[in-house]
Amino acid sequence: MATVIWFVLAHLCQTMMMENRLKFIEYGNPIGKTVVYFHGAPGSPDECSIFDKHGKEYGLNIICYDRLSAELTLQGKGYYQNLADAIKDKVNDGKVDLIGFSIGCHVALETSLYLGDQVGNLHLVAPAAPLVEGNFLDGMAGGVVFSLAMNYPAVFTLLSYCQSLLAKLTPNLLFKILFASAAGKDKELTRNRDFENYITPILKSCFNKSLKGYIRDINQYVAPWKVRINECKVNTYIWHGASDNWSPVGMAKYLADMIPGCKNTEVMEGFSHYSCLFESAPKICQQLAEESQVIPYDAAMPNY
């Protein structure tokens, strides 16, 4: 009888662990070298789909965890440790490269510290730097949102729920509001129906399914984290649009100066936020493939 009870309890514990395990979406080459992508906020794992073609071309298995769905009890260090544990479950003792976009760069950097020397390279695309450093808020398109999160968190939460309502009822209006101040080549993207079809489901997913996770990410971003930057000694590469008004280019320069492991910063003239992501994606994949000497997707598939 005791054996049966032990077996049932063990099965229940295993089931609970499986249910709490972070889900992820993968793109590119399923048997390629693992690269973990950290989407922006707002954002969702589907944001990573732009890497699918490039991942296949360069033999990379690019995955994105649904981190906004993580247990809401996970805050601060526990949140980043949980992400690191999920990545370790995937790669075991192997090496992994990380790519962060926008606020996802903050999460990627924090998580890298819990992965230690398992991280080969860290690529930060349009990274958002700590707001307590520099005069960044005035030059940010979303400066009001971040200012509310820092100074009036209850009002920020209320605003987020209003955005959630828009995402449910009129997602196209939410798209227009968020991109009303688009600059540089992001302006061209906003007139592209394919881009709207790409980004609208991402916004709906974030503000509907993962709203509380989004609020957590923003709250953790606006809190002080400068000291963590000084601990990032992994090989780091920064990609930034010169016309970015979501993450002003000064943020890239600040991070390049503060990250001990920063190897290179590429500032792309005319590019802004999402346009920088689209432009840098194939370049990042090519660089990772050349460093790892991985096999392209077609060449890796067996012939029958």
Predicted regions and their residues:
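Alpha/beta-hydrolase
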Residues: 143, 149, 156-227
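Catalytic active-site module of serine/aspartate enzymes centered on a nucleophile-bearing elbow/loop
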Residues: 262-304
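Conserved alpha/beta-hydrolase "acid-adjacent" motif
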Residues: 245-251
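Conserved acidic catalytic loop of the alpha/beta-hydrolase fold
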Residues: 80-97
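Flexible "cap/lid" loop of the alpha/beta hydrolase fold
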Residues: 122-161
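Conserved hydrolase catalytic core segment
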Residues: 97-138
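Conserved HGGG/HGGXW glycine-rich cap/lid loop of the alpha/beta-hydrolase fold
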Residues: 22-72
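Short beta-strand/loop motif that positions the catalytic acidic residue
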Residues: 232, 238-240, 244
